[in-house]
């Protein structure tokens, strides 16, 4: 992409750390206006597919994106955060320092992952996630929602939806079915995320 910066020691398109990789000609696609800081590594894909970095992504020193992963627009990977192979990081997600996302996991848009947190399951949009064992939903990303134009009534609806999901983890499917009937697109997005989750 245009207008990207890459600092010293960054490696973009290196061979993936995957035993299934057999030398195939795969690639990394980087969008525009990205900031790639010192010693960042972005591995190209294994097999078919691509490793994709969206537009306006900021990857701070030592952060890593594994093979076949996708990082959407405006995401921020803070120092030494890592994204495993085939993982999907949603738009405007913040991965705090030393955090990691396990392979094949999805992190929904406008989510903030706390420092040193290990994400081993899919995380719905608009969340703040802390701890590791077990992964714990702390709250709605209220500041992120405010900064992105969500009115107070919609923020309240998102908070209520996420609270229902995390209180009723055993009945997530029935909660998702209820949320899918919401008048708010953001709440419907949460329901769709849960329904499509595989982890």
What are these model-derived regions, one by one?
Residues 1-135:
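Structural signal for interior beta-strand "rungs" in well-ordered beta-sheet cores
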Residues 3, 9, 14, 20, ...:
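Terminal amphipathic alpha-helical/low-complexity segments used for targeting or macromolecular assembly
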């Amino acid at each position: 992409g245009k207008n990207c910066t890459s600092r010293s020691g960054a490696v973009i398109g290196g061979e993936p750390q995957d035993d299934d990789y057999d030398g195939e000609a795969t690639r990394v696609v980087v969008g525009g206006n990205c900031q790639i800081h010192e010693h960042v590594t972005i591995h190209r894909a294994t097999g078919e597919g691509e490793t994709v970095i969206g537009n306006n992504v900021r990857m701070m020193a030592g952060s890593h994106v594994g093979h076949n992963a996708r990082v959407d627009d405006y995401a921020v990977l803070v120092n030494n955060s890592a994204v495993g192979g085939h993982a999907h990081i949603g738009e405007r997600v913040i991965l705090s320092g030393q955090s990691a996302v396990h392979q094949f996991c999805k992190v929904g848009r406008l989510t903030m992952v706390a420092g040193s947190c290990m994400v081993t399951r899919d995380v719905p949009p608009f969340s703040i996630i802390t701890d590791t064992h077990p992964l714990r939903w702390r709250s709605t990303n209220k500041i992120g929602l405010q900064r992105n134009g969500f009115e107070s009534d919609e923020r309240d609806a998102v908070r209520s939806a996420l609270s229902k999901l995390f209180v009723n983890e055993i009945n997530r499917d029935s909660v998702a079915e209820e949320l899918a009937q919401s008048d708010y697109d953001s709440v419907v997005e949460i329901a769709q995320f849960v329904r499509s989750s595989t982890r």
